[in-house]
Swiss-Prot record:
Protein name: Cysteine--tRNA ligase
Subunit structure: Monomer.
List of residues binding ATP: K269
Record Pfam families: DALR_2 (PF09190), tRNA-synt_1e (PF01406)
GO molecular function, one term: zinc ion binding
Keywords attached to this entry: Aminoacyl-tRNA synthetase, ATP-binding, Cytoplasm, Ligase, Metal-binding, Nucleotide-binding, Protein biosynthesis, Zinc
Length: 468
């Protein structure tokens, strides 16, 4: 497998630190609001990385954190009158619901920064003791970037770059690039260097050290991943702290996903142009949103478009149509050539666009074969096995094929439809075909199509519409 490393800015062969065992850390959300499509893209991108590595035979330990103490969360507390725990637990729960809808696998460990305060304090003390940090009275503990000779080597930035100014300014800092490890505040955690709360960059490096580190290795972990906006200053500052505290590099490989944009501008909460995952899930199934976000390369920036989202759904619809044709079939042996082509595409820095086109071709070929011989049990078994492989590697096709085509219909409406189908079944049994046809036509006027199968009558929405 080859992956694009953000430091050297080229594809590198992936060679794990320890045989077939891979340690991955992904920066998770700051939980003060609902997750937007940018969060979805990042989560899906590195879920695909994990799935691909597992499909290739690697064992993966996957950690994704929650930043649950931060200036934005504290502002939310002030505005809402709610406690830190009330806010963070609420948004963590909603985030996990979104991830479940997108078929993003749960991380092996999902640490919260507030669960690691003792380790963070110990880490800051270590940096103070070795001279890599200093105290500003009444403000906090700062990292001295001059103590890291490799500072800015990760992002490739220069001191003259304008966005160095993204680091909070303070006239008492030794250098404008220096950043807070600990912010003094009597309301929070006790430490011998002063009560306060941790800085964002320190939280992540400590969680990596606590949950993933193997001190026998040259690096703490194999892969550190996150959005491109985290490369500087967040990941740069994590790496600097690690070099000064651990005297080794943080990660062997660094991977970053591109932005979801609106009108060619990065989607973000701070810019006020976010399109929340929950908004998208009102108009398409989660798998369709996942398919859409996988249709472009994970490193590419792309503009969000409702039309493109629906186009992706139509591609997914076609796969589910094939799945419906296989109802009652028994899974057989998958096509090894098909599996190899998918893995080859994903092994090339997660080329999902190519992988999905290979799936499209398989679906077309399968439909042609079934059109010619709809009773070919062996072929049906092979196709079913192929689709199962697609499910495991690409994270789609988790939904029952009948329920998939009932998306957006309320439970109340589903109950009404079921009642009408029962009435129609009774009418057919009594040979009252006129009433049976009347019920079918009544449902057709509501854009509901009935299909009589050996296992009973099933229904689906016949076109894109809002049926409540």
């Amino acid at each position: 497998m080859v992956i694009f490393d953000s430091v050297v800015k080229k594809k590198l062969e992936f060679i794990p630190l320890e045989n077939d065992f891979v340690r991955i850390y992904v920066c998770g959300p700051t939980v003060y609001d609902d997750a937007h499509l940018g969060h979805a893209k990042s989560a899906i991108s590195f879920d695909l990385l994990r799935r691909t590595l597992v499909a290739l035979g690697f064992k993966v330990k996957f950690v994704k954190n929650f930043t649950d103490i931060d200036d934005k969360i504290l502002k939310k507390m002030e505005d809402s009158g709610k406690s830190l725990k009330e806010i963070t637990e609420f948004y963590i729960s909603r985030y996990l619901d979104d991830m479940n809808a997108l078929n993003v696998l749960r991380a092996d460990i999902e640490p919260r920064a507030t669960e690691c305060i003792d380790e963070i304090i110990e880490f800051v003390e270590e940096l103070l003791d070795n001279g890599a940090a200093y105290k500003i009275q009444g403000d906090g503990i700062y990292f001295d970037t001059s103590k890291d000779s490799d500072y800015l080597s990760l992002s490739g930035k220069k001191d003259s770059d304008e966005n160095i100014a993204r680091v909070a300014s303070n006239a008492q800092k030794k250098d404008e690039k220096d950043f807070a490890l600990w912010k003094f505040d009597e309301k929070y955690y006790k430490a011998k260097f002063g009560c306060g709360r941790p800085g964002w960059h320190t939280e992540c490096v400590v969680m990596i050290k606590k949950y993933l580190t193997d001190n026998k290795q040259k690096y703490l972990i194999d892969i550190h991943a996150g959005g491109m906006d985290l490369l500087f200053p967040h990941h740069e500052n994590e790496a600097a702290q690690c070099r000064c505290a651990e005297h080794k590099n943080l990660a062997k490989y660094w991977m970053h996903n591109g932005f979801v944009q609106v009108n060619n501008e990065k989607m973000s909460k701070s810019l006020g142009n976010s399109f929340f995952i929950k908004d998208a899930l009102k108009i398409v199934p989660g798998e369709a949103l996942r398919f859409y976000l996988m249709s472009s390369h994970y490193r590419a920036n792309f503009n969000y478009s409702v039309n493109d989202l629906f186009s992706s759904k139509k591609r997914l619809d076609k796969i589910y149509r094939l799945k419906k044709r296989l109802q009652g079939a028994k899974k057989g042996i998958s096509d090894e050539k098909f599996k190899a082509e998918i893995l080859d595409a994903l092994s090339d820095d997660l080329n999902t666009s190519l992988a999905l086109s290979i799936v499209d071709s398989m679906v077309n070929s399968a439909n042609e074969r079934l059109d010619k011989n709809p009773k070919d049990k062996m072929k049906k078994g092979e196709i079913l096995a192929n689709l199962d492989f697609v499910k495991e590697t690409l994270g789609i096709l988790y939904t029952d094929e009948n329920l998939y085509f009932q998306f957006g219909v309320s439970e109340t409406k589903k109950a009404e439809i079921s009642d009408l189908i029962a009435q129609r079944d009774a009418a057919k049994k009594e040979k009252n075909f006129a009433l049976a046809d009347e019920i079918r036509e009544k449902l057709a006027l509501q854009n509901i199509t009935l299909m009589d199968t050996p296992n009973g009558t099933v229904w689906e929405i016949s076109n894109e519409t809002d049926i409540k």
